[in-house]
């Protein structure tokens, strides 16, 4: 039985040099189709091998929540498009040291709890090596992104194969910060703009920056660089952008038709592959048992290999239930539009 369980997890099949070469191949403009195919295979394996370290850290975070139902914890492997985009934007980055191939989201009601739980994790008896903290709450990104990130280098006493510079990022954020981040991603998905990467229409980016500053004021923390810490001024500029471009109405209009069995039929912990066709606005969901990580990874890789031809976006997530999945990834269900818009319209009334 233990042998079967060990086979669930992918091992690293390539050297550090091969992994970094794969990143450089993706980055180059003159790479051949054959070189790109091999590079993608290497990236898929390096990413999939992070599933075990990610699982270990995810389970520790789950235990930290106790019986709290207002805390969401999910894990995800970074999307191939996001990996490629990051490699091309950051020329000096080695794929071997990309810190968010595996990531956990830990979502709590208040900023105080963000810092308290992050400190609790840092002071716990984990064997992983603490690397760094990124405080985007006290120092928000110019894009408007606000969250607290901890980065750890995974260490295992029992599975030495994973002690290979596998970095896992934990994102601690409030529900309000999560609403903003997923609304931005929703707008990006359905308008086909890479807003998360700082690309897209200037007025769309400015709208989200201003709303993020409003939310920062609400939480009592610094506003985004280039905006005023003045609620009336922020609201006035948001109103002007919305009057010109109708972004609130656009977000409210986004709908997704769920093309799956009733979520309650698989409302349990495990792996979910969310497959969103943003041309038809349809979402398919595939559920896998916790022991079926290899099958889930295989499907995820297959879908991503055809992503450009099919207009499909996919993500592989582990969650405790279907309800937690929907709450943590509302952008794939387009549930975020109503809630985000309601919050914004409170200010615009």
Question: Where are each of the predicted segments found?
Answer:
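Short, mixed-charge low-complexity intrinsically disordered segments
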Residues: 309-348
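Intrinsically disordered, low-complexity polar/charged tails and linkers
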Residues: 2-86
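A short, exposed loop/beta-hairpin motif centered on an aromatic-Gly-Thr core
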Residues: 282-291, 315-317
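A short, charged, amphipathic alpha-helix used as a generic interaction element across diverse proteins
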Residues: 292-307
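An acidic, glycine-/histidine-flanked metal-binding catalytic module
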Residues: 1-39, 162-272
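Helix N-cap motif at beta-to-alpha junctions
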Residues: 109-113
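Short, flexible, solvent-exposed loop/turn segments with mixed acidic/basic and small polar residues
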Residues: 88-99, 274-275, 302-306
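Short Gly/Thr-rich strand-loop-strand
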Residues: 121, 127-159
């Amino acid at each position: 039985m233990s042998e079967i369980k060990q086979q669930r997890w992918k091992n690293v099949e390539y050297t550090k040099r091969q992994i970094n070469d794969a990143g450089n191949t993706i980055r180059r403009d003159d790479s051949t189709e054959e070189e790109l195919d091999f590079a993608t295979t290497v990236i898929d394996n390096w990413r999939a091998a992070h599933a075990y370290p990610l699982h270990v850290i995810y389970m520790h975070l789950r235990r930290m929540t106790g019986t709290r139902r207002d805390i969401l914890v999910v894990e995800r492997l970074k999307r191939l498009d996001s990996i490629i985009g990051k490699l091309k934007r950051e020329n000096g980055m080695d794929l071997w040291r990309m810190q968010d191939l595996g990531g956990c989201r830990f979502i709590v009601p208040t900023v105080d709890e963000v810092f308290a739980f992050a400190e609790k994790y840092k002071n716990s008896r984990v064997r992983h090596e603490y690397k760094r903290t990124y405080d985007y709450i006290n120092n928000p990104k110019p894009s408007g992104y606000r969250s607290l990130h901890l980065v750890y280098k995974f260490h295992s006493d029992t599975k030495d194969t994973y002690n290979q510079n596998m970095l896992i990022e934990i994102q601690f954020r409030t529900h309000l910060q999560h609403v903003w981040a997923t609304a931005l991603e929703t707008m990006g998905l359905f308008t086909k703009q890479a807003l998360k990467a700082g690309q897209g229409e200037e007025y769309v980016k400015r709208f989200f920056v201003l709303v993020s500053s409003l939310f920062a004021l609400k939480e009592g923390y610094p506003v985004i660089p280039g905006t005023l810490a003045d609620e009336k001024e922020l609201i006035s500029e948001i109103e002007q952008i919305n009057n010109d471009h109708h972004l609130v109405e656009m977000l409210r209009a986004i709908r997704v038709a769920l093309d799956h069995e009733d979520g309650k039929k698989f409302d349990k912990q495990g792996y979910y592959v969310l497959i969103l066709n943003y041309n038809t606005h349809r979402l398919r969901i595939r559920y896998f048992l916790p022991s079926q990580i290899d099958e889930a990874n295989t499907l995820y890789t297959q879908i991503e290999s055809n992503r450009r031809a099919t207009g499909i976006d996919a993500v592989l997530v582990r969650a405790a239930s279907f309800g937690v999945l929907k709450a943590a990834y509302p952008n794939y269900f387009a549930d975020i539009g109503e809630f985000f818009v309601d919050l914004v319209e409170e200010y615009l009334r």
